[in-house]
From Swiss-Prot:
It is found in: Cytoplasm. This is Glutamate--tRNA ligase. The gene is gltX. Binds 1 zinc ion per subunit. The keyword Aminoacyl-tRNA synthetase applies. A motif ('KMSKS' region) lies at residues 237-241. It comes from Shigella boydii serotype 18 (strain CDC 3083-94 / BS512). GO terms for cellular component: cytosol. It catalyses: tRNA(Glu) + L-glutamate + ATP = L-glutamyl-tRNA(Glu) + AMP + diphosphate.
Length: 471
């Protein structure tokens, strides 16, 4: 049997991390079994579904490189198929037309609740033989079995049973002729030959209804697996108050897709005590029986740690392709300065996100208007004038411009003036970067370049001279 899974989001908003984890688990299960992964857009909620949300879902899936083998399919383009199946069910007696008014249904609901009963349709039209005009408004209901129970072996939670007496005859077609969500899902899974449905635990109550419809259609019933929810670190359901929840917001905040995928796969699944997984390892090791039944807590600090790891572990050239977007957001012109791959090597240890990297690299490419006030006050003092002049001249005299030779020039300056490296290094750092912190000074000066470094040292010397004149 060919394994076939699906990810079926509703395009009413962005792709959130819970949906992304579900998509990842479905994708991994299919890839682990050499199967196929289908993308289906469940856009039957015409009022809330938007083209922007569809685009956001696609963007998130593409950014995470969760490529699909079929689709995207759109439910709104399959209404003829759904209605044909409903008409067939009406003929076979597994569905019936319901003419009950909203007023009657509301009164029935209030009466049942007053008795402490679970609100459910009482089946009045199921057994009615009244004649109705063809154009009289009605819904179509599924004739749910009235006896027995539905049992399915959830691949994460084990056997789950629902009594058919708990399930009422759900509406499968509205008065406007549009099919309902639970019915469309069933026909889609049947037509698309889905073998395994991996989805959130909020769908557990839909499962027995969908199984009963599948059986009425004499269609194969897929295997179900319901993934637990994701909570914030406070134990409450993950929401915007916990920070970013949109996949693309994590991109915007400077995370690598590898970091988010690695974090999401471990958010409810484990393979021994391994923390770092390549995509190939995820595919190789992923199984549903290793997915936890318990809710997972989202920990941003752990995700940040993973992101820092991947910034430094992945090839700098690859990281640079993602950094480029953030550089563009900061409007930094990188034509005059180090290659972005070299920048990743320079700043990787210091920066936990690509956004932080982009925001802290401007001095490599553009001259700054002024020095950081605190750093200048501390290090660009008259006592720094001679070390800066000497190191400037030694940098200018370097014939082979390498980081190693820059280091020798700084060391030679300290030796010549008989001062510690800090007496040369700190004023030089403030002079060439404008601030008191940077990567190792030799590689920083080397990356900034000889001409620009000397110009900035001269600017710092002018700043010191002006400061002397003001005293």
């Amino acid at each position: 049997m060919k394994i076939k899974t699906r990810f079926a989001p509703s395009p009413t908003g962005y792709l959130h991390v819970g949906g992304a984890r579900t998509a990842l688990y479905s994708w991994l299960f299919a890839r682990n079994h050499g199967g196929e992964f289908v993308l289906r857009i469940e856009d039957t909620d015409l009022e809330r579904s938007t083209p922007e949300a569809i685009e956001a879902i696609m963007d998130g899936m593409n950014w995470l490189s969760l490529e699909w083998d079929e689709g995207p399919y759109y439910q709104t383009k399959r209404f003829d198929r759904y209605n044909a199946v409903i008409d067939q069910m009406l003929e076979e007696g597994t569905a019936y037309k319901c003419y009950c008014s909203k007023e009657r249904l509301e009164a029935l609901r209030e009466e049942q609740m007053a008795k402490g009963e679970k609100p459910r349709y009482d089946g009045r039209c199921r057994h009615s033989h009244e004649h109705h005009a063809d154009d009289e408004p009605c819904v179509v209901r599924f004739a749910n079995p009235q006896e027995g129970s539905v049992v399915f072996d959830d691949q994460i939670r084990g056997p789950i049973e629902f009594s058919n007496q708990e399930l009422d005859d759900l509406i499968i077609r509205r008065t406007d002729g549009s099919p309902t969500y639970n019915f469309c899902v069933v026909v889609d899974d049947w037509d698309m030959e889905i073998t395994h449905v991996i989805r959130g635990e909020d769908h557990i109550n839909n499962t027995p209804r969908q199984i009963n419809i599948l059986k009425a259609l004499k269609a194969p019933v897929p295997v179900y697996a319901h993934v637990s929810m994701i909570n914030g670190d406070d134990g409450k359901k993950l929401s915007k108050r916990h920070g970013a929840v949109s996949v693309m917001q994590y991109r915007d905040d400077g995370y690598l897709p590898e970091a988010l995928l690695n974090y999401l796969v471990r958010l409810g699944w484990s393979h021994g005590d391994q923390e770092i997984f390549t995509r190939e390892e995820m595919i190789k090791y992923f199984t549903l029986n290793a997915v936890s039944k318990s809710a997972s807590a989202f920990n941003t600090d752990k995700l940040l740690w993973l992101n820092h790891h991947y910034i430094n572990a992945l090839p700098p050239e690859y990281v640079a392709t993602h950094l480029q977007w953030h550089i563009e957001q900061e409007n930094i012109d990188t034509r005059n300065g180090p290659q972005l791959a070299d920048l990743v090597k320079l700043l990787g240890e210091r920066c936990k996100t690509l956004k932080e990297m982009a925001q802290s690299c401007r001095y490599f490419y553009e001259d700054f208007a002024e020095f950081d006030a605190d750093a200048a006050k501390k290090h660009l003092r008259p006592v720094a004038r001679q070390p800066l002049e000497v190191v400037r001249d030694k940098l200018a005299a370097i014939t082979d411009w390498t980081a190693e030779n820059v280091h020798h020039a700084i060391q030679a300056t300290a030796d010549e003036l008989e001062v510690g490296m800090g007496k040369v290094g700190m004023p030089l750092r403030v002079a060439v970067t404008g601030a008191g912190q940077s990567p190792a000074l030799d590689v920083t000066v080397h990356a900034i370049g000889r001409t620009r470094s000397i110009e900035r040292i001269n600017k710092a010397l002018a700043f010191i001279a002006e400061r002397e004149n003001q005293q």
